[in-house]
Amino acid sequence: MSATAAARKRGKPASGAGAGAGAGKRRRKADSAGDRGKSKGGGKMNEEISSDSESESLAPRKPEEEEEEELEETAQEKKLRLAKLYLEQLRQQEEEKAEARAFEEDQVAGRLKEDVLEQRGRLQKLVAKEIQAPASADIRVLRGHQLSITCLVVTPDDSAIFSAAKDCSIIKWSVESGRKLHVIPRAKKGAEGKPPGHSSHVLCMAISSDGKYLASGDRSKLILIWEAQSCQHLYTFTGHRDAVSGLAFRRGTHQLYSTSHDRSVKVWNVAENSYVETLFGHQDAVAALDALSRECCVTAGGRDGTVRVWKIPEESQLVFYGHQGSIDCIHLINEEHMVSGADDGSVALWGLSKKRPLALQREAHGLRGEPGLEQPFWISSVAALLNTDLVATGSHSSCVRLWQCGEGFRQLDLLCDIPLVGFINSLKFSSSGDFLVAGVGQEHRLGRWWRIKEARNSVCIIPLRRVPVPPAAGS
């Protein structure tokens, strides 16, 4: 039996259903054809319904629908999204690594350049402008000596200070706590070195660059060698015929240079407890000595008015002129430049290739005395922060002065004054440049020309705080 006959047998409902299905098909066709303007009332109803559905589809979606869409993200889409995130992370990591490599390369290049300049003795780090003048309240004062401080040294690790004075004693101080770590008392004359110590004014000291040995020289022509850590006496060098006025170790070695009022320079090997040689040339008592890594040393010739550079292997010397008075102090800035001070009040910057000063600052600490009878304040000590443009000078003008060396060391500009009353007989920068140590006394280290009663015989630790200077516009 055909499907039509079966439908007729079942009755009208079946044909009505079929008619309804046919009408549905016709409506869909009419909708898809756009009704072509011929639809009847039923078509109008269909148009109204379709417009309602369009308005519903244009309505803003609810958050639940958005969540459903996220949940409906396929596995393939999730893999793609995660892969993109991973690639972005890799790209960022590679960029950071590239920046780090570039920074490290710049650092290495800068360090290599500094090493080359340092080996040539021409390195000049610009730090002076960053130094902030310390307040008086920030200066730490260490008291322990009975008489004027004459000299001091700072250990290579900046942990301790050794100071010596006219009371013939040596004190080891802790930088952190300011306490005494050890005291080497005055030795009695004729006691045959028991206990070991100095029996006359200690005029100079030096410490080896590895911090192992301490050397001290006095007016009794003796050089005493100590173990710096324990302050145990090791041995005594004799040979000078007058007061020992200057000592310096060659950096990186245990070779010791000494100078004296007997006008000579001597070379010693401390590790082997041996004398090496003697050099002559100065025409008057030598006042001070300094050395760095090269096998040479520099001396301040006092009243003979010369600065000399001693080339030890060649047994030769270079002679420099510039000051008008007694040259009492000297310090190397780097292997090619040095600073010196004299009792005519002048401070000079020198280059080893020039026989005259590159820069000369007259009356560096001003004038003293009645109007018309003024005299410059003597320069009693100088110091330089190694391989930088920062220099310090001391006098008895109630202050320590910090200076900036200009480009090529051809200028000396005043940075600030640090108030300190008394004779500044010794100045030393820490290796890090974080502080400056001053040895203060009521009298000059080499004599008793004046006495400043209000001064206190002390060691002063002056903090040097740095404030980075912003680069100039357009640099």
Curated annotation (Swiss-Prot):
Recorded consequence of changing K25R: Impaired acetylation, leading to promote rRNA processing
GO BP term, pick one: rRNA processing
Entry comment on modification after translation: Acetylation at Lys-12 and Lys-25 by KAT2B/PCAF under stress impairs pre-rRNA processing. Deacetylation by SIRT7 enhances RRP9-binding to U3 snoRNA, which is a prerequisite for pre-rRNA processing.
Keyword terms, alphabetized: Acetylation, Isopeptide bond, Methylation, Nucleus, Phosphoprotein, Repeat, Ribonucleoprotein, RNA-binding, rRNA processing, Ubl conjugation, WD repeat
WD repeat residues: 144-183, 197-236, 239-278, 281-320, 322-360, 374-413, 419-460
Comment block on domains: The WD domains are required for nucleolar localization and U3 small nucleolar RNAs binding.
Protein name: U3 small nucleolar RNA-interacting protein 2
Organism: Homo sapiens (Human)
Encoding gene (name): RRP9
